[in-house]
Amino acid sequence: MGNGSVKPKHSKHPDGQSGNLSNEALRSKVAELEREVKRKDAELQEREYHLKELREQLAKQTVAIAELTEELQSKCIQLNKLQDVIHVQGGSPLQASPDKVPLDVHRKTSGLVSLHSRRGAKAGVSAEPTSRTYDLNKPPEFSFEKARVRKDSSEKKLITDALNKNQFLKRLDPQQIKDMVECMYGRNYQQGSYIVKQGEPGNHIFVLAEGRLEVFQGEKLLSSIPMWTTFGELAILYNCTRTASVKAITNVKTWALDREVFQNIMRRTAQARDEEYRNFLRSVSLLKNLPEDKLTKIIDCLEVEYYDKGDYIIREGEEGSTFFILAKGKVKVTQSTEGHDQPQLIKTLQKGEYFGEKALISDDVRSANIIAEENDVACLVIDRETFNQTVGTFDELQKYLEGYVATLNRDDEKRHAKRSMSSWKLSKALSLEMIQLKEKVARFSSTSPFQNLEIIATLGVGGFGRVELVKVKNENIAFAMKCIRKKHIVDTKQQEHVYSEKRILEELCSPFIVKLYRTFKDNKYVYMLLEACLGGELWSILRDRGSFDEPTSKFCVACVTEAFDYLHRLGIIYRDLKPENLILDADGYLKLVDFGFAKKIGSGQKTWTFCGTPEYVAPEVILNKGHDFSVDFWSLGILVYELLTGNPPFSGIDQMMTYNLILKGIEKMDFPRKITRRPEDLIRRLCRQNPTERLGNLKNGINDIKKHRWLNGFNWEGLKARSLPSPLRRELSGPIDHSYFDKYPPEKGVPPDEMSGWDKDF
């Protein structure tokens, strides 16, 4: 410019330059981070994919392990059975598969059979009966207050935690655990002494409080027992022989509980609960006139639900199908009223009061709100569907109470009289034959039965004694003589069970139950003279074949169902169903034998003694909840499974494991392919964990089993009339042909005299 001025150059402001550089750096950093995120995402996806693969592999391996475990267990049982068959065939190689062993294999080879062939047979177990009328040394009446032992709160907590860690005990009710803790008492042992000794009977459960214990089998060390661990729990269920020894390595302190105290606690808490629930139900106008058996079923269906303060149990205007009884706490009842924006308090309900009872009759639109007034409110709940399935609809119950059912039954009997005439004639013929034989044996000496009878062969042996095939001297009339060692009965406190078997069998006359003709006794034995059924044991045939086809299984199940129908009508529960207790008569029809665990109970009543065969006992027996006829339906489901597969569904390496498997239930169990859909459905419905949900124990009773689709088309009338050919019939050469039974060695030694007098009325 003319004035010499110079135009300044444009220059970047230092701050602007810094800002641009900063933005570029950020963009670069973001790009780098994005690349890193993508890399990490790819890496994460790869790891997730790898993890998914590992999970799938783990799931497959878990399934494979479960299948292999089940298969191994099955193979072990099957191995025993195959070894038994080898013994049956005199050690020769098997010529046929287990499914194709002919029915008469036993007949051809029975002379070669030894006691080894009994190895797979299942044995029954029993605690002392709760009613020990014939036990001259029975203890005094149980008193919970006298059984309690003082402990501080920290000891109680440690014992409670130890019991709750145990696989079996953790399933008991909290109140039962609490009572057990109260009654456990201290037992101290010196170093080197035995707390439990292998081979000796057990009577206590223990919790280790101080010291060190080791478990031995023979001379072999198996394990050590950690502090505050429970052991010996099987002994509180029933009288059993210890399978291992527990030795004190140091001085030891334990807490112990006796079997008798445990069983009294279980019975006491369950009976108290049932009585409380029964009183609640008797206060409900809709239910107060129901008979005891219906009330008992409702009690067993009740579930406990808990609510905290402010929780709505029922909302006004909602439809409901559930009935509630307040078991603990308080609730308030509020209702919408004209002129108020908020529902108004109507009243407060307390323990023992109920609401929602109209829901048992039909869908009920709730007319008020029911709200918990405090924490831990407990309600007993039953819904209409459960109520209807278990005891019937309200209309059905009304008819029942008015006597309409009795009228309908009489009309039904008239309608079916002609159809049932053949089975009535058969029953009459059986009764006449039984009377004639009873008259004959009534003349025999009551203390010397073998003056008139001679032993032909041994049909069976057991812990109790032996069963001998006998015949009347100089006559072609045969019987089975059950010889029970009196000393064994006293030692195991089973006097009540023996008397119960006698009383029950004397009352029965059914073509599906073995007949009792006479009893005898001497200084060493009590005897039962029974019907001789010489077609063999169902267990032996199942052992030889491996499993049965469906038609044969249906026939067996039908025979048992008829036997149960007859027994349950008389108020008798059987409690020991298994193939070992089913025997074939000359026509191949099955009969129930061994009524040592059978018991007569009143309508709506329960019984408490732990008894049965481990693989067949129902969950409520294991948990000492009290049981009734529904245990027989459970065992029928187990029998169906064993007939079709050759093995029961629950079988552990020891009895306690078997019980824990039973308590886990059958619902989630995978069935083998040889059990088809229909029998599987029957088994699952018979083996429901809740007794009130079992087929046979619903409102239609045992008819639900007979009408199950697996048994569709079965000829029940032909079975009852014995005109239906048996798939298990075998030829007999005469009344003393015992060729279908295993051969047993002579009894070793002579049992001692037992003269306490418990059998004076036998």
Swiss-Prot record:
Q: Which PROSITE patterns does the protein's record reference?
A: AGC_KINASE_CTER, CNMP_BINDING_1, CNMP_BINDING_2, CNMP_BINDING_3, PROTEIN_KINASE_ATP, PROTEIN_KINASE_DOM, PROTEIN_KINASE_ST
Q: What's in the keyword line of the UniProt record? A: ATP-binding, Cell membrane, cGMP, cGMP-binding, Kinase, Lipoprotein, Membrane, Myristate, Nucleotide-binding, Phosphoprotein, Serine/threonine-protein kinase, Transferase
Region of interest: Disordered = 1-25, 112-138, 740-762
Query: What catalytic activity is recorded?
Result: L-seryl-[protein] + ATP = O-phospho-L-seryl-[protein] + ADP + H(+); L-threonyl-[protein] + ATP = O-phospho-L-threonyl-[protein] + ADP + H(+)
Which residues, per the entry, are lipid-modified as N-myristoyl glycine?
G2
> Phosphoserine: which positions carry it?
S110, S117, S431
| Post-translational modifications reported in the UniProt record | Myristoylation mediates membrane localization.
Q: Does the keyword Manganese apply?
A: no
Subunit info here reads: Interacts with GRIA1/GLUR1.
Q: What family, per the record?
A: Belongs to the protein kinase superfamily. AGC Ser/Thr protein kinase family. cGMP subfamily.
Q: What is this protein called?
A: cGMP-dependent protein kinase 2
